Amino acid sequence: MASSNFLVLLLFALFAIPQGLANYEKPPVYQPPVYKPPVEKPPVYKPPVEKPPVYKPPVEKPPVYKPPVYKPPVYKPPVVKPPVYKPPVYKPPVYKPPVYKPPVEKPPVYKPPVYKPPVVKPPVYKPPVYKPPVEKPPVYKPPVVKPPVYKPPVYKPPVVKPPVYKPPVYKPPVYKPPVEKPPVYKPPVYKPPVEKPPVYGPPHHP
């Protein structure tokens, strides 16, 4: 086996060395680049991978005791506002012409008389009912005397609760994507001009 490998290597060396020397003596031959069109591969369909839902047990937070915060009352001094003088505003009388309303004529409506026959109710006779008087003899109830009950004091030893170790709860950071709000278009609002009546001030005496 070793001799066969040695013979193969020897033959390869004898063939390769002269070929290499021949290639070294010849100048390099220019070969233009060959255009290879890109190979288009059809898309491979990959079915979606379904992941089973992961159950996360709810994290119980112990109630936190917050002592009440005492806020002292804040003294606010009374605010004194000086009287504001408002001159009388003269309003000229507004003349409204009388509105003519023609009289409305309603034709008379005829209502025939309604005949109601008289209703006869015969008298109902109720015989008198005799109720004899009920006599109840007096009932004697002797006074009830209850002796005092002695209750010895009950000793309750103090209850000692060992400290409970609560491991810290790890909360992973929650990623909140930025919220993009589209711009809201507000059409221009037309405001008609406001006409203010002239204000007449008090008359000035010379």
UniProtKB/Swiss-Prot annotation:
Signal peptide (UniProt feature, chain positions): 1-22
Sequence repeats: 32-36, 37-41, 42-46, 47-51, 52-56, 57-61, 62-66, 67-71, 72-76, 77-81, 82-86, 87-91, 92-96, 97-101, 102-106, 107-111, 112-116, 117-121, 122-126, 127-131, 132-136, 137-141, 142-146, 147-151, 152-156, 157-161, 162-166, 167-171, 172-176, 177-181, 182-186, 187-191, 192-196, 197-201
Expression sites by tissue: Expressed in hypocotyls, roots and mature root nodules.
UniProt superkingdom: Eukaryota
Keyword Signal: yes
Stored InterPro entries: Adhesive_plaq, Extensin-like, Proline-rich_CW_protein
Subcellular location: Secreted, Cell wall
Segments for region (34 X 5 AA approximate tandem repeats of P-P-V-[EVY]-K): 32-201
Region (Disordered): 51-84, 132-206
Location (main, coarse): secreted
GO molecular function terms listed in the Swiss-Prot or TrEMBL record: structural constituent of cell wall
Gene Ontology cellular component list: extracellular region
Function text: This is a developmentally regulated putative cell wall protein.
Protein family according to the UniProt entry: Belongs to the plant proline-rich protein superfamily. ENOD12 family.
UniProt name for this protein: Repetitive proline-rich cell wall protein 1
Organism: Medicago truncatula
